[in-house]
Amino acid sequence: MADLAKIVEDLSALTVLEAAELSKLLEEKWGVSAAAPVAVAAAGGAAPAAAAEEKTEFDVVLADGGANKINVIKEVRALTGLGLKEAKDLVEGAPKAVKEGASKDEAEKIKAQLEAAGAKVELK
């Protein structure tokens, strides 16, 4: 047990660069790859219908600023806290995300506010 405590102590003392080098050495020694978890994540996407039902985070995407861009810019500023130039760039550069990782209720509220201002909005 003392050996394990010593190993933990030694690993804790490593710098980030040393830890990265250790990781590479262990991959070579054991013949494994750190990329393996990516394959597991890709396999998890095999059931998109189930994932769509359980989706809890949404991205509010401004698809088009519409004809009344001034009102849309004002609404984007109010919702995001962006400055005038940043909000204008976001509206004119549509399609762009206004809010990422929003809850369903928050995303629908933001969508309704932007649509009331004249924008076309998508939830992703």
UniProtKB/Swiss-Prot annotation:
Q: Its biological function? A: Forms part of the ribosomal stalk which helps the ribosome interact with GTP-bound translation factors. Is thus essential for accurate translation.
Q: Which organism is it from?
A: Brucella canis (strain ATCC 23365 / NCTC 10854 / RM-666)
This protein's GO cellular component annotations are:
cytosolic large ribosomal subunit
Q: Which family does it belong to?
A: Belongs to the bacterial ribosomal protein bL12 family.
Kindly give the InterPro entries that the UniProt entry links to this protein. Answer: Ribosomal_bL12 (IPR000206), Ribosomal_bL12_C (IPR013823), Ribosomal_bL12_C/ClpS-like (IPR014719), Ribosomal_bL12_oligo (IPR008932), Ribosomal_bL12_oligo_N_sf (IPR036235)
The protein's name in its UniProt record: Large ribosomal subunit protein bL12
Q: Name one GO biological process term.
A: translation
Superkingdom of source? Bacteria
